[in-house]
A protein has these predicted regions:
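Fe(II)/2-oxoglutarate oxygenase catalytic core
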Residues: 1-231
Length: 231
């Protein structure tokens, strides 16, 4: 799994395009981030691990570096100060000092498993003082072969408007960068906040297996994890 540690897979991405799509929609697809073989190998390793696999742990500071400018711009547009630290290690230290020591999601950090007839309810990860507004999701199984149903769904709630649903068409090895919760949207009178949540619809056959990589930890008793469970 050493090749999964490589920073090259992220360095070769079009981060200008990714930032533009995140500004416009709150999500950006990363098609074929992993090959089929890499996806299967990572699925086996993630299922056997008690936490985040080491090969993916190395992705966190890399993603942080690529997304930091956008994250700080979002914070500024939402009236949040001060800016995030330039180093991922310093950001994590801020979280620990604020009591954010709980890996997420639970019950198995970072691994998403939704069995047949199950679904994942709408949720977001915006609890705590040190929150990074973006995260990665990655599909480790093949739609139509390993499972049926199980669409990755996002909803965007805007002030005084109906919620906007979105379906992300993920395939084996595809990833997406999505907002963890609030994000700014430019309106006629300036920027305003919208809130995004994500879910996995009912799995009709097989098992949905993926990875959810957050760049911040949760408080010891976060509200989101108490009220929303993977079913």
């Amino acid at each position: 799994m050493d090749r999964l540690n490589s920073q090259d897979r992220f360095a070769r991405l079009d981060w200008t395009r990714i930032a533009a799509e995140l500004d416009a929609e709150g999500h950006a697809l990363l098609l074929q981030l992993l090959t089929a073989d890499e996806s299967r190998a990572l699925a086996r390793e993630a299922a056997a691990a008690s936490g985040l696999p080491p090969c993916v742990q190395a992705w966190r500071p890399v993603l942080y570096g690529h997304l930091l400018a956008l994250a700080n711009r979002w914070r500024e547009h939402m009236g949040m100060q001060p800016g995030l630290p330039s180093r991922f290690e310093d950001f994590m230290r801020q979280g620990r000092q604020a009591g954010q020591t709980q890996p997420q999601p639970q019950p198995q950090p970072h691994l998403l498993r939704v069995p047949q007839a199950g679904h994942a309810p709408l949720r977001s990860y915006s609890e705590g003082a040190a929150v990074f507004p973006l995260q990665l999701v990655l599909l480790l199984c093949r739609p139509g072969q390993d499972f049926e149903g199980g669409e990755f769904v996002m909803t965007e709630q805007r002030p005084r408007m109906q919620s906007r649903p979105m379906v992300l068409p993920l395939g084996l090895g595809d990833a997406a960068i999505i907002a963890t919760g609030p994000r700014p949207v430019r309106g006629a009178a300036g920027f305003y906040r919208v809130h995004l949540r994500h879910a996995i619809s009912r799995v009709h056959r097989g098992e949905w297996l993926g990875l959810e990589l957050l760049l911040h930890d949760a408080p010891s008793a976060p509200k989101a994890l108490q009220t929303d469970r993977w079913l």
